[in-house]
Amino acid sequence: EQVWKTFDPQARILAVRPDSTIPAVRLASGRLKNAPLPLRLCYVQSAAKFHSETLSLLCEDTQAGVELMGEGSAQADAEVIALAVEALRAAGIRDFLIELGQVKFVSGFLEEAGLTAQQCAAVRDMMAHKNALDMQLYLDRLSIEADVSRRLMRLPQLFGDAAVLDEAEQLTQSPKCLRAIAHLRQVLSILQDYGCADCVSIDLGLTQQANYYSGVVFHGLAAELGQPLLSGGRYDGLPAQFGRPMPATGFALSLKLTLMALERQGETFAPPVPDVILSFAPGGLRSAIAYAHQLRDKGVSVALLYGLTAEELHQRVDSGEASAAVYLNGSVFEQYGKAVF
């Protein structure tokens, strides 16, 4: 329901890419099928979804993401989560939090309660929206014991620090749930080694919209936004659908929401300036082009300007339009400003 669809001239249904995980899995199972594991892939590309509740906010977005395939350990989960933390830090987001959940804990909890598949889907949807009132009314209509209903109502409230895991263990006897909790404890321990455990909290009622997630899932929240700007998790069953069974995890960062968060932080975005601006005396164009190529080969960004005098170049450096200037006068290179080459 959240995929944009259209038709081709033969009336076949076409879908706009809703996320980047499935294309990455298809790549790993096709062109990269003989590549050694684990695979570490990254991408920056557009995706589009139909958001019925936030249609006016965004539909198409550019995502930057990573996928780690072929490694199913807690270390792999922690590596990807730590990378998500570093991505938000590198982007300049100052006040953020990564919330961790566990799909297997939720599914085990609902199975233990004896709910049908349809009932589980309804409860998951209400948990995703933190809609406690509707969830309580829905459970009241079901023929389940009061104690089961009480424990189910605790599920969306199981969020906070690691102490939440202790409470969760007291609410269930399901081996599936207990294994999921133990796995989360491992991930949290490894995140301590990465030095980013203070950026992480637990939300055992956390769910994802995509139905292919199978283990640890997470969201990245910024104080300036009312919705996640980053999401990801483990999707071990998905690669097998494309002919290459293997564990996998990853995340995607919304660049549109990241820019929105930065703007609300008060960040301003100045246009980039070149390292060097370069101009030349009459008849010196060929030499100037050759010199610009030499600098660019060394990793120096160069803007070639036409018809400026040496004095005008100096003024532009002084005004902050470049770090340095070079004026080519015959065979003489007149340099001004910071030495970056």
Label each residue range with its predicted role:
Residues 1-15, 57:
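Polyanion/phosphate-binding surface patch
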Residues 11, 19-34, 40-93, 139-341:
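Positively charged, Gly/Ser-enriched RNA/tRNA-binding surfaces
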Residues 16, 101, 253:
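A conserved hydrophobic position in a structured secondary element of the catalytic/binding core
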Residues 60-64, 100-108:
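Short, conserved phosphate-binding/catalytic loop or strand-edge motifs used
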Residues 103-139:
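Short terminal or interdomain "cap/linker" segment that borders an active site or interface and mediates
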